[in-house]
Regions:
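Phosphate-group recognition and catalysis centered on beta-loop-alpha active-site segments
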Residues: 1-227
Length: 227
């Protein structure tokens, strides 16, 4: 079984997260796919950023939703990088992408781009929110979806199935073999996040995971040889 390695917000352990520089480095590092996060700007652009506000990762302050794309462009997202929009990432790298959305509104905006650019084969959509997963699947037939969870109950596999997700992305610190086996029995894949040490990588392989999200290029290099 192949083990997929996803670059977390590019390779945020060595580059400014969710920037074109980080995504290009992730692709050059041989990541199987690149994970990123999307929020809608005030004027409806799909801004690539993890947090709901810009404070942590830029030299600005305030919510993304309160700023236009032009205002977001003025901010430094690290080492002179600007906040990209999703369409720019599509042009900057050719890797498969896993795009995390935070709500139904973002699902609808992303659905438009996926349909217009025929990206069903390249873009996988993930969310912590069941309703966002359900909505993107409704809007884009055939799109691959991922339900993410940091903490979960005994119903997490049933939740993923109900939302139409093909994959569960679960916190490696809380993952058990029982959950992985339940998911696999229902033909769901399981990705562990975030795998940043050799011990965590060995755990991911011992749990028979289908892949892992990592901040560091070296996890991709060593992951190919870890049994």
């Amino acid at each position: 079984m192949s083990f997929l390695t996803l670059g977390h917000r590019g390779v945020m352990g060595v580059e400014p997260e969710n920037t074109l520089r980080s995504f290009v480095r992730a692709e050059a590092s041989g990541m199987d796919a690149i994970e990123l996060d999307l929020h809608l700007s005030k004027d409806g652009a799909l801004a690539v950023m993890h947090d709901t506000d810009v404070d942590r990762t830029t030299d600005g302050t305030g919510p993304i939703a309160a700023k236009t794309l032009a205002e977001l462009r003025e901010l430094d997202a690290g080492q002179g990088e600007r906040i990209p929009v999703f369409e720019e990432v599509l042009e900057a790298v050719s890797s498969p992408l896993q795009a995390e959305i935070k709500d139904v509104a973002a699902a609808r905006a992303l659905a438009d781009v996926i349909r217009e650019r025929e990206l069903v084969g390249r873009v996988e959509v993930s969310s912590f929110h069941d309703e966002a997963v359900t909505e993107i699947a409704r809007l884009v037939p055939g799109v691959r979806t991922v339900l993410i969870a940091s903490r979960w109950g005994a119903d997490v596999v049933d939740r993923a199935k109900a939302a139409g997700a093909a994959t569960l992305a679960l916190n490696i610190r809380r993952l058990t073999l029982e959950v992985v086996e339940q998911a696999h029995a229902e033909s769901l894949k399981v990705i562990g996040w975030v795998v940043n040490t050799q011990d965590q990588l060995r755990l991911a392989r011992a749990l028979n995971l289908d892949g892992a999200t990592t901040d560091f290029p070296e996890i991709r290099r060593t992951g190919r040889f870890t049994a």
